[in-house]
A protein has these predicted regions:
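Auxiliary Fe-S-binding modules of radical SAM enzymes
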Residues: 21-106
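Core AdoMet radical
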Residues: 1-5
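Catalytic cores of alpha/beta
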Residues: 7-20, 77-78
Length: 106
C-alpha cells in the first residue's frame, strides 16, 4: 500500500522492497490507497505513485519490482496503473527519462 508520510519516497520504497526480498518475499503488488473515510491524509496521487515507481527502475532488481495497481471501486477488480514507457507516437521512455524511437519493434 502506498501511503503518504510512510513509504512515499523512492528511498523508502527501495528499502522496503529490498527488505522484502531479503526475507524471501517478492513484492507482488503495490496498492493505490482506496478512497475511504478517514484515509485522505495518506492519499498519494496516482501520477506521483507512477513517478515514484519509475524512479526505482535501475535501482532495484526486477524481482523487487511490484505491479502498481488500483482496486476499482465497486468490486470491478484490480488493474495495473504502473508507469507507461511506450507512447502512442512510437517512442519509449528510457530509464534515464529521455525518449527514444522504438524502431521496428512495434
Amino acid at each position: 500500500m502506498l501511503l503518504r508520510g510512510v513509504n512515499d519516497s523512492a528511498d523508502a520504497l527501495e528499502a522496503l522492497f529490498r527488505a522484502m526480498l531479503a526475507a524471501r518475499v517478492k513484492p507482488y503488488y503495490l496498492h493505490q490507497l482506496d478512497a475511504a473515510p478517514g484515509t485522505a491524509r495518506f492519499h498519494v496521487p496516482i501520477a506521483e505513485g507512477q513517478r515514484l515507481l519509475a524512479s526505482l527502475r535501475g535501482r532495484v532488481t526486477g524481482l523487487a519490482w511490484p505491479t502498481y495497481i488500483l482496486d476499482i471501486p465497486g468490486g470491478h477488480g484490480k488493474v495495473p496503473i504502473g508507469p507507461g514507457y511506450l507512447n502512442t507516437d512510437g517512442t519509449v521512455r528510457g530509464p534515464d527519462g529521455r525518449y527514444y524511437s522504438a524502431g521496428s519493434s512495434l
